[in-house]
Structure formats: structure tokens, C-alpha cells
């Protein structure tokens, strides 16, 4: 077992930690757990690096130039560290996450201001590392893959912290990926697939619900590859886990992301039909509509199999809102390949989507392909693709006008007395003149307008709090 960091002495001054998060929802979860794991050592979270004794950059390596953005931020932190040193104050600087995993020792060589480099599977040892550095120890680089050890060592979040984070929460149930898509760094930065045991997931979910969370999003790089054992010791998949979580009293909503088409099994599809708490929304990345490009990406499915999966899902849950990821300009992509992607979008119809220009990631097979698509072609294709997706998203949102939906209010809006919540379909819903007591509640809302990126509505007369 790793050495634990020191417990804070009663009455000792609270130290402060600032974590800046880049990238995906899993990093949001990881950042929150870093704060949790430092709490027993006397650290409290602050909103600005200037106020902190420790600054952690929790990084993402998916997009191009991710590392350079981190080094740029480290340049600013170097100046802050100098300022603090001039006032007799110390500042420890750490880099965590996937850029840290990929860069390793190179990060401390290029940026000596960094005291600590730790990969995504080692942040549970943060108190130990900080204690060693505080005692004058040398800089630390730790990029091992002890995934099970990490989750077994994480404390439950304090109730007050969970309350402060709101009525929605992320819960990581799976990490890593074994698919090895040729464009993706995840298998190299997050490691092979690992699934958390059912009991630990249920314990964490109950803790969140006890603290006021009403909606939990299950996270994984390949979340529907999660597997475990049911109460009888038989193999279980995500559909079983969702049913078990839905039995937790007080948990109103469940979601999960991100999925792979290869792992959409019948039990999971049936859960969409049978479990009321599972929201009618599915993010199922396809990346391309061209079979040739899908094969080059090593996606292990073709366009037709994706269509068949969508057909089974819609048969089980006719009102489901579909979301996806698309990459344009993958090496070798022709105009015909791109048109096949547009055809798939027109045929399926998406309520929401995320789209990107292909960016070579060092160490991935696609990065060394010779037939890279010119940048101007990528940009032009992305513009066309996003225009089509935007039309579909607007049509879906506009079609919600006149409907009454249960909305979970989890944010305060920009305007006075404005609240923002989530519909079952993950749309942002804005209402004005909202009573403050509805924050964190699930309430029926009449949708009046549907815009491209949000809905606007009003409370139903005599609307009661649903949860």
C-alpha cells in the first residue's frame, strides 16, 4: 500500500489547492477526487491559482497541441511561483492526467518549475507525494497504471463538498480502452480496460445520493465495456449495473457516456426500454459514415452495423435522443468518403453531436500515414458537416416546443432569478423568475421555445417538485 500523507493537526491553518481541468468529463471527476483525497491533509479547494499552496493542471491529450497549451500555462505559473517566493510563500506545481502520462520525465526537463508529474492512475497518492515534496524531496514523476489500487484508495467525498457541487454528479465506473482506434491516444495514456466492482460503485452512488445528488452520469472511456459480477457471482454487464443503481432510493436519473457501438448489447438496449431512471439520451460515437475510413480507423464496425444498432435502440426507446462524434479529414478521406458521412447523418438524425478536424496524435498509427488531408480541406468539410448537424439539432429542439418536461435545475443563469436545468434529453432549459428553492429540484416545465443550443420554458402552473 502507498504511504499516506499526514493528517492535518486540529486547529492548524487550512492549506489551499487549485485544480484546473482540461478535457473530458472523466477529468472533471478526477479533479474533484484529487480535492477529496487532499482534504484529510488539511487542504481546501480555492477558485484561483493565486490563492493556492498547490496548483494541479489536470490535462487532456485528445486534441492537437494539447501539450503546448499546458506548457504555456506552466509559463504563467512559473511567474506566479516567483512572485510567491518573493513574498516568502511556497507554491507546489503539479501536472496530472493524460498529457502528464504521455510526457513523463520530458515534462520536468522542459518545465523545471513542475514539482510533480502524475498520470491518471496515480492521483490517489497525491498526499504522499505532496508530503515528500514539502519535506524537501526531489521532483516526482509517477506514471504507473495501478488502476485498482487507485479506486480502492479513494475516500468518499465529504457531504458538504458534494452538496456544493450540485444536484448532478459524475461517477467513473470504467477506465481505459482495448479498442486501439488508430487515431486515439487513450489506450496509451489511460491503459487497458478496467471495470470497478459493483459494490464499490453502489457505495459511491449511495454516498452521492445521500448528499443530495439526483442525477448520476456513469463515466468510462468505453463505458459500455464495463463488466462485473451480479449478486449470484454470474458475469454482468452495464445493463445489469444500471438496473441495480436504479433501485437506490432518491436517485431520479441515470446517464452513461462514452459508448462504443461494438459493446451495445441487448441487455443494455433493454435497460433503455425498462428502466425509467435511465434518461432517453445516448451518446454513441460513429466517427465516419465511410466503411473504408472506419476500417482505416480500426473501429471494428461498419456503417450498416451502426444503422442496425440504432434501429434496435429506437425500437426499444422510440423517443431516444441520439448524439455522436465525428472526425473529418482522417488520412485518406476522399470527398466520396465525406459524403458517406453526411448521408449517415441525414439517415440517422442526431439531436446533438460533437465534430472535429482530424489531428495527428504522436504515437498513434494514423499519425504516420502519408495521405494526410490538407488543412483547408478539413476546415471546409467541418463547416459543411457542422451546418448539417446544426440544422438537425435546431429541428430537434424546436420540436420540443409545447411539450411539458421534467427538468432538473442544476445551474443559476446569467439573469436575476434565472435557473438553468437539464431536460431528459440533456438539453439546457432556461426559465426566468424562478423561485430559488427550486435549485437542485426536478420540476415540470412547459417548453415555449427551442433554439439551437438550448430550450426556454416556464414553470407549469402549480408545478410540484418531482424529486
Swiss-Prot record:
GO terms for molecular function: 4 iron, 4 sulfur cluster binding; metal ion binding; N6-isopentenyladenosine methylthiotransferase activity. [4Fe-4S] cluster 2 binds at residues 177, 181, 184. It is found in: Cytoplasm. Keywords: 4Fe-4S, Cytoplasm, Iron, Iron-sulfur, Metal-binding, S-adenosyl-L-methionine, Transferase, tRNA processing. It is an enzyme of class 2 (transferase). Binds 2 [4Fe-4S] clusters. One cluster is coordinated with 3 cysteines and an exchangeable S-adenosyl-L-methionine. It comes from the Bacteria. It catalyses: N(6)-dimethylallyladenosine(37) in tRNA + (sulfur carrier)-SH + AH2 + 2 S-adenosyl-L-methionine = 2-methylsulfanyl-N(6)-dimethylallyladenosine(37) in tRNA + (sulfur carrier)-H + 5'-deoxyadenosine + L-methionine + A + S-adenosyl-L-homocysteine + 2 H(+). Residues 398-461 form the TRAM domain. Its cofactor is [4Fe-4S] cluster. NCBIfam families: miaB-methiolase, MiaB/RimO family radical SAM methylthiotransferase. Belongs to the methylthiotransferase family. MiaB subfamily. PANTHER family: CDK5 REGULATORY SUBUNIT-ASSOCIATED PROTEIN 1, MITOCHONDRIAL TRNA METHYLTHIOTRANSFERASE CDK5RAP1. Monomer. HAMAP family: tRNA_metthiotr_MiaB (MF_01864). Catalyzes the methylthiolation of N6-(dimethylallyl)adenosine (i(6)A), leading to the formation of 2-methylthio-N6-(dimethylallyl)adenosine (ms(2)i(6)A) at position 37 in tRNAs that read codons beginning with uridine. This is tRNA-2-methylthio-N(6)-dimethylallyladenosine synthase. It comes from Parvibaculum lavamentivorans (strain DS-1 / DSM 13023 / NCIMB 13966). The lineage of its organism: Bacteria, Pseudomonadati, Pseudomonadota, Alphaproteobacteria, Hyphomicrobiales. The gene is miaB.
Amino acid at each position: 500500500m502507498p504511504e499516506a500523507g499526514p493528517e492535518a493537526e486540529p486547529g492548524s491553518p487550512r492549506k489551499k489547492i487549485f485544480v484546473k481541468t482540461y478535457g473530458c468529463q472523466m477529468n472533471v471527476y478526477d479533479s474533484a477526487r484529487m480535492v477529496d483525497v487532499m482534504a484529510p491533509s488539511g487542504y481546501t479547494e480555492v477558485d484561483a491559482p493565486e490563492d493556492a499552496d498547490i496548483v494541479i493542471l489536470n490535462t487532456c491529450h485528445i486534441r492537437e497541441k494539447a501539450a503546448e497549451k499546458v506548457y504555456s500555462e506552466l509559463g504563467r505559473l512559473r511567474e506566479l511561483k516567483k512572485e510567491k517566493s518573493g513574498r516568502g510563500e511556497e507554491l507546489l506545481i503539479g501536472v496530472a492526467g493524460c498529457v502528464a502520462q504521455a510526457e513523463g520525465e520530458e515534462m520536468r526537463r522542459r518545465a523545471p518549475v513542475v514539482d510533480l508529474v502524475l498520470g491518471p492512475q496515480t492521483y490517489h497518492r497525491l498526499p504522499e507525494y505532496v508530503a515528500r515534496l514539502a519535506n524537501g524531496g526531489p521532483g516526482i514523476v509517477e506514471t504507473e497504471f495501478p488502476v485498482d489500487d487507485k479506486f480502492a484508495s479513494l475516500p468518499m467525498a465529504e457531504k458538504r463538498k458534494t452538496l456544493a457541487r450540485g444536484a448532478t454528479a459524475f461517477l467513473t465506473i470504467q477506465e481505459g480502452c482495448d479498442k486501439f482506434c488508430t487515431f486515439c491516444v487513450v489506450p496509451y495514456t489511460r491503459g487497458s480496460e478496467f471495470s470497478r466492482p459493483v459494490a464499490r460503485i453502489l457505495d459511491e452512488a449511495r454516498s452521492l445520493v445521500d448528499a443530495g445528488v439526483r442525477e448520476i452520469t456513469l463515466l468510462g472511456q468505453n463505458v459500455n465495456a464495463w463488466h462485473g459480477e451480479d449478486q449470484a457471482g454470474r458475469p454482468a454487464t452495464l445493463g445489469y449495473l444500471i438496473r441495480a443503481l436504479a433501485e437506490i432510493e432518491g436517485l431520479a436519473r441515470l446517464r452513461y457516456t462514452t459508448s462504443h457501438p461494438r459493446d451495445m448489447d441487448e441487455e443494455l438496449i433493454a435497460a433503455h426500454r425498462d428502466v425509467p431512471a435511465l434518461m432517453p439520451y445516448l451518446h454513441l460515437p460513429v466517427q465516419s459514415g465511410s466503411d473504408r475510413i472506419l476500417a482505416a480507423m480500426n473501429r471494428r464496425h461498419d456503417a450498416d452495423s451502426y444503422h442496425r444498432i440504432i434501429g434496435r435502440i429506437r425500437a426499444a426507446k422510440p423517443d431516444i435522443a441520439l448524439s455522436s462524434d465525428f472526425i473529418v479529414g482522417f488520412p485518406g478521406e476522399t470527398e466520396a468518403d465525406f459524403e458517406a458521412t453526411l448521408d449517415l447523418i441525414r439517415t440517422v438524425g442526431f439531436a446533438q453531436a460533437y465534430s472535429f478536424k482530424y489531428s495527428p496524435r504522436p504515437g498513434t498509427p494514423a499519425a504516420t500515414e502519408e495521405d494526410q488531408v490538407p488543412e483547408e480541406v478539413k476546415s471546409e468539410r467541418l463547416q459543411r458537416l457542422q451546418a448539417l448537424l446544426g440544422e438537425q439539432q435546431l429541428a430537434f429542439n424546436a420540436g420540443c416546443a409545447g411539450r411539458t418536461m421534467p427538468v432538473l435545475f442544476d445551474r443559476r443563469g446569467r439573469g436575476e432569478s434565472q435557473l438553468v436545468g437539464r431536460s431528459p434529453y440533456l438539453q439546457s432549459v432556461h426559465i426566468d423568475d424562478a423561485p430559488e428553492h427550486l435549485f437542485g429540484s426536478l420540476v415540470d416545465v412547459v417548453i415555449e421555445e427551442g433554439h439551437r443550443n438550448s430550450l426556454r420554458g416556464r414553470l407549469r402552473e402549480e408545478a410540484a417538485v418531482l424529486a
